[in-house]
């Protein structure tokens, strides 16, 4: 009972997703209407989505369907990005979507990387570096494209880029690694305490350990992302206000409260949460178009 008071695990996957969706929506309102405080709130969304992606790939019963959903959504967003640049009406709105990237591609590549790492064959595990390399290439291409000092980057088109370069992919991988580190911790502890490491498997104590390590990994990767941007800024212009991304660390507070339970998971909510992304963007963009045309 004392442990419950100290570490109340209150949030299921359902509630983490709700929080992620709400903060993402606030963020996109901030993008369309240039409201800075909304962008601050929006920094909490990415780590939560990445955390859920890592949990999803580890517990999914059908990996092919899981990546198919992410792949379809990534393709839809890619088409939207192309349309925003090629269709005159949307191009004239100057929404700046070409710089946004495809968030579902971040999640897809992160999930594929984790799937490779979960494989028992070492040469399959090594393939996990390919999604991360893709994210790094996307990050570099976006940096040069936003800088504009080298002209348009044609070797890596904007409609196949990740939204956060390597950062989102690394987060998904990192949250999976948190589970491995937790198991290692209990294994090392068993050597000194004499308690079998399997005793903690599937327990509340194990979940707390995973949550704490996940929050620490989030902090380290966020600081690394900040450092990389800070170094880049010394040499090229960086359009993104990367300092704001440091607020992502706050989402670790929600991760610390994760119970490990799935929670509400009806089919309509599963597919609705995917469809919500393009629909809410379309609604916010339409409202912005009306407001700015008045």
Residue ranges and their predicted role:
Residues 1-294:
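Alpha-helical transmembrane segments and their immediate juxtamembrane cytosolic regions
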């Amino acid at each position: 009972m004392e442990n419950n008071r100290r570490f109340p695990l209150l949030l299921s996957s359902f509630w983490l997703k709700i929080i992620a969706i709400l903060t993402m929506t606030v963020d996109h309102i901030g993008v369309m209407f240039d409201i800075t405080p909304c962008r601050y709130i929006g920094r909490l969304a990415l780590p939560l989505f990445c955390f859920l992606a890592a949990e999803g790939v580890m517990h999914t019963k059908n990996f092919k369907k899981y990546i198919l959903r992410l792949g379809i959504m990534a393709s839809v967003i890619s088409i939207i990005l192309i349309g925003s640049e090629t269709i005159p009406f949307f191009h004239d709105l100057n929404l700046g979507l070409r710089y946004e990237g495809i968030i579902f591609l971040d999640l897809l590549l992160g999930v594929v990387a984790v799937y490779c790492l979960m494989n028992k064959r070492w040469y399959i595990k090594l393939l996990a570096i390919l999604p991360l390399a893709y994210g790094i290439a996307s990050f570099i291409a976006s940096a040069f494209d936003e800088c504009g000092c080298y002209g348009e980057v044609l070797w890596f088109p904007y409609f196949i880029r990740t939204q956060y370069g390597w950062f989102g992919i690394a987060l998904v991988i990192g949250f999976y690694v948190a589970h491995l580190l937790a198991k290692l911790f209990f294994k090392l502890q068993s050597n000194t305490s004499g308690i079998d490491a399997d005793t903690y498997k599937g327990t509340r104590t194990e979940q707390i350990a995973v949550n704490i390590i996940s929050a620490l990994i989030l902090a380290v990767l966020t600081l690394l992302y900040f450092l990389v941007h800070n170094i880049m800024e010394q040499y090229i212009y960086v359009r993104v206000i990367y300092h704001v991304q440091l607020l992502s660390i706050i989402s670790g507070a929600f991760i610390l409260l994760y119970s490990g339970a799935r929670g509400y998971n009806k089919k309509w909510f599963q597919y609705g949460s995917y469809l919500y992304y393009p629909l809410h963007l379309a609604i916010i963009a339409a409202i912005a178009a009306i407001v700015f045309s008045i």
